[in-house]
Structure formats: structure tokens, C-alpha cells
């Protein structure tokens, strides 16, 4: 009888740990928000994600504000692609054209609708995830057979 009780306790413990692990994984999956660059969004890499973070540089000369409202529009670029962003809240004080941002939101009819915007806090800082994704990518040149890394200003 003692062996049967021990077996029952072990099975219940395994069931409880399995249930807790499953619930934790499901909660994490539901709450994860991935970071994508404009070129990845336009390529369709976000098909599984309805809510994600968009990272890039605010294109100079693209910022527009509707007078008398908080509604703003601007272009975010990664040097390869451009994506229009709409935002209807107070912008961070450090928001500037030509600066890196990370916006959280979702796509609607080809425009990224931002719910939250984070601007970098000084001229030398770029969020690690954004910096990693904006590394120069090798490109093919017509007069060369080997890829050359190009950087965009």
C-alpha cells in the first residue's frame, strides 16, 4: 500500500508540473512581442504576428502632424524599405527625424498603427535588438562577383 501511495504522489506531482509548464509556455507565447524591421514587415515575415514591434530610423522630412490633434504620421526605414506609421498619442520628448525608434502596434491596410513609441535617449545609443537587425547586409554588385557589405547613412 505504501508503494501505491508513493506512485500516486509521483504521478500527481508530474501532472502538476506538466500543467504548470504548459500554462507558463502558453502565457509567454501569447505575450511575446517580436521586433521586425520595415523590410521584414513588407516581405511578409510578420504573417503569424498581429501585434509586434517595429524598429528603424524616422526618415528625415517625413514627419506630419494633424493640426489641433495628437495624430502624427511619419516614415520608418531600415535603409532597405520604408513603412508609414501612424500614432495618436503624445510623442516622447526625444523623438526626432533621423533617430532610431521602436514602435509597438499592428498593421492595418499597409500602415503600421503604433500604440507605443520608444525613442533612443542619446545620439550614441541604439537598442541592442535594433542595432543587431540594422547591421550592414552583403549586397551583390554587377561588376563584382563577391558580396560587399554596404552601410547606409
Curated annotation (Swiss-Prot):
Periplasmic topological segments: 28-153
Gene label: ccmE
GO CC, any one term: plasma membrane
Pfam families (alphabetical): CcmE
Binding site for heme: 121, 125
Coiled coil: none
One example GO MF annotation: heme binding
Protein's membrane topology: Single-pass type II membrane protein
Major subcellular location class: membrane
Annotated transmembrane regions: 7-27
Keywords: Cell inner membrane, Cell membrane, Cytochrome c-type biogenesis, Heme, Iron, Membrane, Metal-binding, Signal-anchor, Transmembrane, Transmembrane helix
Annotated function: Heme chaperone required for the biogenesis of c-type cytochromes. Transiently binds heme delivered by CcmC and transfers the heme to apo-cytochromes in a process facilitated by CcmF and CcmH.
Biased composition range(s): Polar residues: 131-141
Record family assignment: Belongs to the CcmE/CycJ family.
Region called Disordered, residue ranges: 131-153
Keyword Nucleus attached: no
Cytoplasmic side: 1-6
Protein name: Cytochrome c-type biogenesis protein CcmE
Subcellular localization: Cell inner membrane
GO BP term, pick one: cytochrome complex assembly
Signal peptide residue numbers: none
